[in-house]
Design a protein with these regions (language model features):
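Non-heme di-metal
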Residues: 2-8, 13-15, 21, 33-350
Length: 350
């Protein structure tokens, strides 16, 4: 049993009717005024009813989770399992980049949200790392893939531009913040999808894995606007800021698709259960992927693809994504969060 998390339970305002998240949208950066032609920013939720973003303690027991945690669906299982390959290194990188940018934040509300975001992402990284350990215990070793992911985030997207490329430090930081904002657009969409993916329950999916995915997905919806607001705050002003935001999505989309297909292919090829089935190396199949989509076990291409033109709108703000109410309701009921809270309570009484 693992029991991880870096802070106290998240708290909320008086009522979770919070579909307008406390986002800052197209606001000006530090010390700026809004630029002519830019849409007004969405109003922030006033204190004290503001939704507070903070990490939660969670506890997952992987002992009884099978390798194919969606029964009879190795393709759907491994397409979703790519999350575990990408997120430990990716979310550590989010935290590192945000730490670099913290001195630029002069908005107390945003600073509080960013610190809560960093705590949540650090917790996500730890929990998905435990799934990699569980896969290794089932003889599915992922290190040959994850070392490339580590190289991407630690070297190519590290604190210094790769290969000595002469990019000013401030611009390199802004570029990486734009990448995180674009990635978080997809994680919010995926988070909202998994919260409503009843087909996963009907397919008999492992309850522990579903709880991990839905707990994580709910927190992605919960902090859906923070990375965008951070970029808007630190990313300069006017048209250059907007153009860099578009550039971030233009880079993230093909790279993320490539990593996902590569990751799913890797998992299929190295799956010991599939290798035992007979001659021929198992492969990722787009046909099988689309069949899983049709059964509701994976998000549709339209659900994922439509997130891109929405993000390109000048007036866009991520508070439009998903249902914060549904996310809050799941977080209040998550078995992992409740188990960890109960363990803390029992320890306090001893």
């Amino acid at each position: 049993m693992s029991d991880h998390g870096q802070a106290s339970e998240a708290s909320m305002g008086p009522h979770p009717d919070m579909e307008a998240h406390a986002g800052r949208g197209e606001h000006a950066g530090p010390g700026e005024h809004a630029h002519r032609g830019e849409p007004p920013a969405p109003e922030a939720c006033p204190e004290p009813g503001r939704y507070v973003i903070a990490p939660r303690r969670v506890s997952f027991d992987w002992e009884n989770t099978p390798l194919h945690w969606i029964p009879g669906e190795p393709t759907a299982t491994h397409v979703i399992n790519v999350l575990h390959l990408l997120l430990p290194a990716g979310e550590r990188w989010f935290v590192k980049v945000f730490k670099e940018a913290l001195p630029l934040v002069d908005d107390p509300g945003l600073l509080k949200d960013v610190k809560g975001f960093m705590g949540q992402e650090a917790t996500h990284s730890v929990q998905h790392s435990h799934v990699l350990d569980h896969l290794a215990a089932q003889r599915l070793d992922t290190t040959a893939y994850t070392r490339h992911v580590d190289f991407l985030f630690e070297k190519l997207l590290g604190e210094e531009p790769p290969l000595g490329v002469p990019v000013p430090a401030r611009e390199w930081l802004r570029f990486r913040l734009s990448l995180i904002a674009a990635i978080e657009q997809f994680t919010a969409v995926l988070g909202d999808w998994v919260l409503g993916a009843d087909a996963l329950d009907r397919a008999g999916s492992d309850a522990v894995m579903l709880d991990l995915l839905r707990w994580h997905g709910a927190e992605e919806v919960e902090h859906r606007a923070v990375a965008f607001d951070m970029y808007q705050h630190c990313g300069g002003e006017g048209l250059p800021r907007y153009a860099r935001r578009i550039e971030g999505m233009a880079v993230v989309t093909p790279v993320l698709l490539w990593l996902w297909v590569w990751g799913a292919s890797y998992l299929m090829r190295h799956d010991p259960a599939l290798l035992r089935r007979g001659p021929g190396r198992p492969r990722y199949s787009l046909r099988e992927h689309n069949r899983a989509v049709a059964r509701g076990l994976l998000p549709t291409w339209g659900e994922l693809g439509s997130a891109i033109p929405r993000y390109f709108r000048r007036s866009y703000h991520p508070s439009q994504e998903g249902s914060l109410r549904r996310a809050a309701e799941y977080l209040a009921a998550s078995p992992a969060a409740r188990a960890a809270a109960g363990a803390i309570g029992r320890a306090a009484m001893t």
